Design a protein with these regions (language model features):
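Flexible cofactor-recognition loop at the NAD(P)H-binding site
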Residues: 10, 44-46, 69
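Short-chain dehydrogenase/reductase
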Residues: 50-55, 91-97, 134
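C-terminal helical subdomain
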Residues: 119-151
């Protein structure tokens, strides 16, 4: 399988990119969306994950978007809720595309052990646990619309 992964400089994207199993044999990481079989839509940058989801889905490839359990926490007017709104938009776009037959999945993780959540004092999943969930979706013979995984 050929994988295209966004957000590879740090956190979950960097962890996935450096996995030996994705850099040997028939598995490899490619440098652009057109050359992949599986797109892991990992980099959060405003609403850009939504745009990338629509762009790749139109090419008929499997897309796994890394959402967030924060997409359930979208009420209020504080800046902190903007992240949840952006992830809710990703979740809703995934929902729409799934129901028209696209092979898209949104995985909504709770906190996981990364630079971004280093100061958060809540239980966190390991990056390996996150990868194990992603791998389960990849290996599943059925389409998986969405899954939320938290500690």
């Amino acid at each position: 399988m050929r994988y295209y992964i966004t957000g590879t400089r740090r956190g979950l994207g960097a962890f996935i990119t450096n996995l030996p199993e994705l850099n040997t044999g028939a598995n490899r990481i490619v440098d652009n969306l057109d050359d992949c079989d599986i797109f892991i839509n990992c980099k959060h940058d405003g609403f850009s994950q939504v745009d990338l989801l629509y762009e790749d889905e139109s090419k008929g490839k499997k897309v796994i978007s890394i959402g967030s359990a924060a997409s359930d926490w979208i009420h209020g007017h504080k800046d902190v809720y903007k992240y949840g709104i952006e992830k809710a938009a990703l979740r809703n776009a995934n929902d729409q595309l799934y129901y028209v037959g696209s092979d898209v999945t949104c995985i909504n993780f709770g906190y996981f052990d990364s630079e971004r959540s280093a100061d958060v004092d809540y239980p966190k999943m390991s990056l390996q646990q996150c990868w194990d969930t992603i791998k389960w979706v990849i290996d599943n013979p059925n389409r998986v619309k969405e899954i939320t995984v938290c500690v």
